[in-house]
Every structure is written in C-alpha cells, then in structure tokens.
Amino acid sequence: MGENKGYITHVEELGSIHISEDVLASVAGTAAYEIEGISGLMHVTSKKGHARGVRVSVESDRAVLDLFVIVRYGFAIPEIAEKVQNAVISAVESMTGFSVKAVNIHVGGVSFNEKF
C-alpha cells in the first residue's frame, strides 16, 4: 500500500487499487454520522482546501483518520467516541480493504438538536 497524490494505493497480484482519500473520508464520515449521539461533523479545512469533518493520512501503510464531530447534549462523550471509532474502522476496512491504524476523535462542539 502506498500514497499517490490524494489516493491510497494497494498493490494486488492482479494490479493496483487506487482509492481517493476523499472516498475514505466519506465512508468514515457516514459511519460516524450513523451513530446515535452524533449531531454532525465540523467543517475543517484539509491541506487540499476541502471542507469536511474528516482528515485522512497514511502512516506505515495504514490509514489514520481524524474525525471532527459535534456530540448531542446528554450523551457520554467517551462512549460515543468509542462507538464512532469502532464503526469507522469496520466501515473503512470492509468497504476499502485498507487497514486502519487509528481513528482520532476530536469533539469540537455540543448540539442541543438531534442532527446538526
């Protein structure tokens, strides 16, 4: 597995698979948003200038995902964060075949609405 201009590459016997970092971010963000207690993702600017609540990097041929979330008031942040981490790892690994090294959760806000 390697990195090439915004894509994560996995070399297989039959050829290479290139998946955009934006795809990994989208999968991770969707998995996080499905967790009860998550109101939404914060808008952060990535190095490429795209606003999204997920940053993707590669360390030791494994994906590292940073998610910037807004938690609904009344939910235990540590429990929600762990649920998000597990959901993101499961979704990214099953949909892309790439290993996830870490999912770092950054809670940047609390919402009183169900979804932000």
Describe each region flagged by the PLM:
Residues 65-82:
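A short interface-forming secondary-structure element
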Residues 102-116:
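Short, highly charged C-terminal tails/helix-capping segments
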Residues 39-70:
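Short edge beta-strands and adjacent turn/loop segments
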Residues 30, 78, 115-116:
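Short, well-ordered secondary-structure micro-motifs
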Residues 2, 24, 58, 112-116:
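A domain-level signal for the structural core that forms small-molecule/cofactor-binding pockets
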Residues 1-34, 38-47:
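Terminal low-complexity, intrinsically disordered regions
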Residues 36-39, 52, 101, 108:
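A short, local hydrophobic-aromatic micro-motif
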Residues 77-96, 100:
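Short, non-transmembrane amphipathic alpha-helical segments
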